[in-house]
């Protein structure tokens, strides 16, 4: 089976092949495709499948469902928010990354049944040092305000010190690769320590001034003991960085764990965002990465019991159907009836994150049959925006209600009357 390429850390957690989507070769030109395919969502937020160390071609976007902004653009868009993925490892100031070293092994895998992203990378740096990194990433469906990354790092032919950077990046902008449409929808209101350890960044949307907080804390372990030394917090403009170092021995594995939490003032007052996130991360660390991941997998196990479709005789087709179900049910929100399911779900910024008539025509039947509470929320979303639909009808000379072709958070028409194409 394909999972046999991994060590026991991931092999024992991965499901059988018909649940797995693989990337077995790194090609920079394919980055944006795999960032979309490997996006993870939990109904509350979604983050693209970018690499932790960063790459030249990337759109490392994170969205919280329903957080829109217009600013100087011609329509309200899902706002790109501070990205917490960043983890960079250095040996003697040399970055251990897939675009900075020779790649000896490379595999990434989306486990749809467990709803997590795994990876295995073995690289050789300019001085011949080989490092094996395996990792697992998830955004919890058990507690939608918890996200985590665990890296298993093994220096294969050297001993020494590995320096670690954990980053929250608040510089991300919408349509970074489209000069005509570039825009930054947020401004920073805080860049500070989370507590004694950890980083905290807070931003607000430019138009409605909705505050969003993001906090993270990194730890390192060997044989169950914390080993991260020389910890410090630095701020570089709109980036917040937690630094530490690890003494490593040849052939001995260490674990690096990043605990993350995000809230908006839709869930708690703006003045309480920092303390709420601080307490959430304290609870996450106390609960433990494994226990939260297990609770997350248990939620998806129940979801798949309702949603799975089994096709015998064609594993590839079965995998494709499950892939569609996975992303669809990962985006639907059973707890919030003020958000919808956009045409690109929470995997990218095309269509501005807007909901079309596709929701009712193609998605609602699925949710009605499999997840009726989510279906009810999708209908309530339209009900909450009925007054805007009436205003839209009146604007266009009609009686009654006319729902917009493209809908964001306020029910006004977001489809432009005209647009410019190259």
What do the predicted segments below correspond to?
Residues 323-328, 359-374, 385:
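Alpha-helical support elements that line or immediately flank enzyme active sites
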Residues 345-354, 359, 365:
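Segments forming glycine/polar-rich beta-alpha architectures that bind adenosine-containing cofactors
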